[in-house]
Amino acid sequence: RPTCVRVRIVSDREHFGVVSDIDDTVMVSMLPRLVTAAKHAFLDRVSSREAVPGMANLLTTLTTSSASSEGVPAGTHSPIMYLSTGAWNVVPTVRSFLERSGYPAGGFLMTDFGPSNTGWFRSGPEHKRRELRRLARMFPHVRWLLVGDDGQHDPEIYAEFAREFPQCVAGIAIRSLSEIEQFMAHGSFEAMVPDALWTVPESIPVWYGSDGEALLENIRGRGTAGPLTGR
């Protein structure tokens, strides 16, 4: 039967967008990543999810404050892509969570859960690398602000992409996990030091903060909350 879907066309006149991780960036998971993937694949309880404080406001501000100057059609906002190692079958659940929590509507770049042709488990980092490169090829005129967390591989993946495609990166914003979140992700209360961020080209700004409010304050401290230039 016919199905209605939203379509967001990115025009050649648009030059700014946002890519955001989901787990521990916009949504508190408090679980090791493999367990998180399994949970998201089989449980469908939106009410059990908790939003990271301030992240909805951060992403909304980033995608709306630049819209008028970036060729964005009236009545919408700058494009945003939610990039996750979660399975495609959880998109309806995640979309409901994002809508309920006040996040801007966007597209999803998910993966398949389970064995692949090369192994029992699919590589989450490789999935993210592949999708970022695909965005660079599809929208070479767009500079993306990359939003993630320091719980796993986001700093390394984003830094690598920034070195490979500096012309496609407007900035990198990383949420630092709490001690208990670090323990659930790594088995240690010691904060992870994202050394990879020091390898980001100096022309690309990098921000670090404990939640969306801290990140937005740091970004505004640079004099802008939209398209970002200079460090």
Across the structure, where does each feature detected by a protein language model lie?
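Alpha-helical substrate-recognition element adjacent to the catalytic core
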Residues: 1-125
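C-terminal cap/substrate-recognition subdomain and adjoining C-terminal extension
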Residues: 86-231
